[in-house]
């Protein structure tokens, strides 16, 4: 059995260490108090800056150790999609329309072919998200970086009265899941350390090689969510990234009673190799890359809109009692 912490990513330890940076960052809010761009207190996935009738939403994220798989097989044309997806999917959680991004690419040494392939993914991701890449930084650091690191910072905009905070979520609301394309960009450290030493990247599983499963690009949910926001009163939005279903706690203090889809593909392979169910749901998206919370009255219309883009399904309901229960797998996070 291998857990995320044993693989080298101890989220509890990280959270404890991170509090020092968070505390320092919060103290800087006073530097913009009463000025244009004053930080708001209502963001969860993205920070919100006050710009009159609008909030400017801002977030930052990266591809993580997925780049190690790309490097191992010499295929870099999709990690740009991943980086953009990780950022824009966070922006839409507050109801913001993503508009622009700057990238950060840290490398040991320049390689034209790698740059060309990364650029293809960045362009494809930007097109899908409807954003402009307006700048960036390439850091060549042979003494510090042994490989590659790709990250970005994205901004979006939302009218103040249209921010999605989760405050409208009520017990009984419908919880809808939008399918993921696979592992996305979270849990790669655990997946790599568990599977690659045992099978190798060319191992075939369900007619696909392992590296293909691991490099499948993160799905971008901008188009379906923006259309949904125009048609239905959305109560809450959650990007299911690092932390798996625990991300739902970011949008409300109410609980969730869910029935998750069958464990298939890369998740089935990981589970078959000894990762317990609770750890699976704590680390991976488990086939659900994005969650939408709406009233029961709006459920059918929401499903109709979302299914025009990606397979979407009712997962369950919001409950009065806190905690997340995956009823069909007997998993509880209280």
From Swiss-Prot:
Primary location: cytoplasm
EC number from the UniProt entry: 6.3.3.1
Reaction(s) this enzyme catalyzes, per UniProt: 2-formamido-N(1)-(5-O-phospho-beta-D-ribosyl)acetamidine + ATP = 5-amino-1-(5-phospho-beta-D-ribosyl)imidazole + ADP + phosphate + H(+)
Metabolic or biological pathway, per its Swiss-Prot or TrEMBL entry: Purine metabolism; IMP biosynthesis via de novo pathway; 5-amino-1-(5-phospho-D-ribosyl)imidazole from N(2)-formyl-N(1)-(5-phospho-D-ribosyl)glycinamide: step 2/2
GO biological process, one term: 'de novo' IMP biosynthetic process
One GO CC term, this protein: cytosol
Subcellular location, record wording: Cytoplasm
Molecular function terms, GO-annotated: ATP binding; phosphoribosylamine-glycine ligase activity; phosphoribosylformylglycinamidine cyclo-ligase activity
Taxonomy, superkingdom: Archaea
Keyword set, alphabetical order: ATP-binding, Cytoplasm, Ligase, Nucleotide-binding, Purine biosynthesis
Protein family membership: Belongs to the AIR synthase family.
Name used for this protein in its record: Phosphoribosylformylglycinamidine cyclo-ligase
Gene coding for it: purM
